């Protein structure tokens, strides 16, 4: 059976995400430094990475962010991701299931993640404009523990065949009220501003995934698919993950914030947690590792990251995630002049 246009696009996305992956490329996390205090008065043995994230208890403040699904190749990737997440004890999100709503024959390319991770925390994923019936189908497909609704206006604008109507807020509110699992509203690499956070909170959303600029760039990916490749000027459009974190500081206590976008190594995770993230996600870095290494090697990498993170906690004098909120730790954050100016521009 010939591959559908949407399934082909999923394969293109994976290939282009890898083509444009630059793991050590500078991003906004480099504009955040941590004041070193030579007497942290901690021990690595005392560090506990376990934390409460919304209604869940996680073994560490890490998760594997949404990537792919919808074709034979991406189904194989999802099976591997399921195994890796299970072995590491990490929550994981699938890529957009929209293609499987239109073509149920590709649903197994998503369900395989649950098949290989029967007891893990798995998030489904749909565009924010989908109706309740589609959301329920997406959840059932994965026996999902939550549903991500992605906001991807910039991607759609650049995508040759993308949507052109972005009236989503009422639908998001309706889905939050109707669904029996938590709804996580996420960006796909262009960040979430404070005004957007306020709109979503008023609509009933209690889980945000900031999905900031700095990692996988869907402007680059979709522009490559355009005949004239004529929208490259949007390459730097959007808010970085760091800017998004600054924008949602001093938020309501019952709003859980996940941060992803440009996470390259454990130090970026530490910085995101210090800036207020409840948990931190990785996509491009994991995909790159998966495409070039065995499952066991990726598992070893992620396990080592968790071990390194414990040492970084001790380095800054922290033994639990909730201690990052203390003024003692917040005083260690050193922002670049550019970030200081941005923070001062944020209005409540």
From Swiss-Prot:
Which residues are noted in the entry as FMN-binding? 66-68, 96, 125, 186, 216, 262-264, 283-284
**Record-listed Mg(2+) binding positions:** 156
Q: What is its EC number?
A: 5.3.3.2
- Give the InterPro entries listed for this entry: Aldolase_TIM, FMN-dep_DH, IPdP_isomerase
Per UniProt, subcellular location reads as:
Cytoplasm
Reaction(s) catalyzed by this protein? isopentenyl diphosphate = dimethylallyl diphosphate
Q: Which GO terms describe its molecular function?
A: FMN binding; isopentenyl-diphosphate delta-isomerase activity; magnesium ion binding; NADPH binding; oxidoreductase activity
Q: For this UniProt record, give its keywords in alphabetical order, as a comma-separated list.
A: Cytoplasm, Flavoprotein, FMN, Isomerase, Isoprene biosynthesis, Magnesium, Metal-binding, NADP
Organism superkingdom? Bacteria
Needed cofactors, names only, are: FMN; NADPH; Mg(2+)
Its GO biological process annotations read: isoprenoid biosynthetic process
Q: Name one GO cellular component term.
A: cytoplasm
At which positions is substrate bound? Answer: 9-10, 155
In the record, the note on similarity to other proteins reads: Belongs to the IPP isomerase type 2 family.
This protein's assembly is summarised as:
Homooctamer. Dimer of tetramers.
Stated role? Involved in the biosynthesis of isoprenoids. Catalyzes the 1,3-allylic rearrangement of the homoallylic substrate isopentenyl (IPP) to its allylic isomer, dimethylallyl diphosphate (DMAPP).
Against HAMAP family, the record matches this protein to: Idi_2 (MF_00354)
Q: What is this protein called?
A: Isopentenyl-diphosphate delta-isomerase
Q: Which gene encodes it?
A: fni
């Amino acid at each position: 059976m010939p591959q559908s246009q949407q399934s082909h696009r999923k394969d293109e996305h994976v290939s282009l995400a890898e083509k444009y992956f630059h793991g050590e490329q500078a991003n906004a996390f480099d504009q955040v430094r941590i004041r070193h205090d030579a007497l942290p008065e901690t021990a690595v043995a005392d560090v506990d990475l376990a934390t409460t994230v919304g209604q869940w208890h996680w073994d560490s403040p890490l998760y594997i962010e949404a990537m792919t699904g919808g074709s034979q190749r991406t189904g194989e990737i999802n099976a591997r991701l399921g195994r890796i997440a299970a072995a590491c004890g990490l929550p994981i999100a699938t890529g957009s299931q929209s293609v499987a709503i239109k073509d149920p024959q590709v649903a197994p390319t998503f369900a395989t993640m649950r098949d290989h991770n029967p007891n893990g925390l798995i998030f489904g994923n749909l565009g924010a404009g989908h109706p309740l019936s589609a959301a329920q189908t997406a959840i059932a497909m994965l026996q999902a523990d939550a549903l991500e609704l992605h906001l991807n206006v910039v991607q759609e604008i650049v995508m040759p065949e993308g949507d052109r109507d972005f009236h989503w807020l009422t639908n998001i509110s309706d889905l939050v009220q109707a669904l029996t699992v938590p709804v996580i509203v996420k960006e796909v690499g262009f960040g979430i501003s404070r005004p957007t956070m306020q709109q979503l909170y008023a609509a009933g959303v209690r889980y945000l995934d900031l999905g900031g600029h700095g990692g996988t760039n869907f402007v680059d990916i979709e522009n490559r698919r355009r005949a004239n490749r004529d929208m490259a000027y949007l390459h730097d459009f959007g808010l970085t993950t760091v800017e998004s974190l600054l924008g949602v500081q001093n938020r309501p206590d019952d709003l859980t914030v996940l941060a992803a976008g440009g996470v390259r190594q454990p130090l970026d995770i530490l910085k995101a947690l210090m800036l207020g993230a409840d948990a931190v996600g990785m996509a491009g870095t994991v995909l790159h590792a998966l495409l070039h290494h065995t499952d066991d090697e990726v598992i070893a990498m992620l396990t080592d990251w968790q071990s390194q993170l414990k040492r970084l906690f001790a380095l800054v004098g922290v033994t639990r995630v909730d201690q990052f909120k203390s003024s003692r730790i917040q005083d260690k954050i050193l922002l670049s002049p550019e970030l200081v100016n941005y923070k001062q521009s944020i209005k409540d």
